[in-house]
Amino acid sequence: MQRKVLYGVLLAAPFIGAYPVFVMKVLAFALFAAAFNLLIGYTGLLSFGHAMFLATAGYATGYSMQTLGFTPELGVLVGTVAATLLGLVVGLFAIRRQGIYFAMITLAFAQMVYFIYLQAPFTHGEDGLQGVPRGRLFGLLDLSNDVALYYVVLAVVVAACAFIVRVVHSPFGQVLVAIKENEARAISLGYDTDRFKLLAFILSAALAGLAGSLKVLVLGFETLSDAYWTMSGLVVLMTLVGGMGTLFGPLLGAALIVALEDRLGDIGEWLASTTGVAWFHSLGESATIVTGLIFIACVLAFRRGIVGEMVARIKPLRATS
């Protein structure tokens, strides 16, 4: 029932007052968080460099469409493939280590990628790629129409999330969970855990790249902020807020964080007029502080995230009913 309501709201969003570009931005980040959750929530690998896949796909899609004249479907494909190949290269090095060492290797690669994009001529440095055209999907559907693009993005994100669900519930996904819970036992059962972790890393990178390609298609630009380490931190926060290791948690976390960052100024103005505290007028300029406070609250108060806490509370009620 809840899923039907959610699907109904998403299908009707452009006609019930929702700003299509904002909702598409939320969908792109929701897919980014879901891709990251596949790695940390089900495989137990914490990456501090997932922003490099988002940015790589964004730059590849933007450049191929703006400079090479590729169609949207080819541009998205190029971006996703670029992120997948980068995931393969990084994964071959990173999976040889565990825990904090794995995280630091991904962070080191991400910083290296950031400085490459800062200097590379095709990224236009700090100016980024501006004015990326949306084009026509398969030469037929004009994506300059926000509503048309919205349904394309929605279909892609739903299909990608369905793919993640299928992966999680497949024998491959069960092996990933076994590696997360007890890698030594998985090895003793004869599984090549490094191979499974590498495949999970590549899948996560590819899906993060798909999110980056959709994002540049929606917004029409790609900047260095997508490659910076703070973007990797942001997707960690989205996953923690929603609920790590849950299917809907990262989607909810992404929606909340993106909405908060986008509407923080409006919230500050409302609080200032309600409470009379002038400081709230500058709340929109304090997004980093607010997200930091949210991160602390998650760690201290509800470590399982919103969806994780809800599931933990509902399960005993179902068992007793």
Q: What positions do the PLM features span?
A:
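Transmembrane alpha-helices and adjacent helix-loop boundaries
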Residues: M1-S321
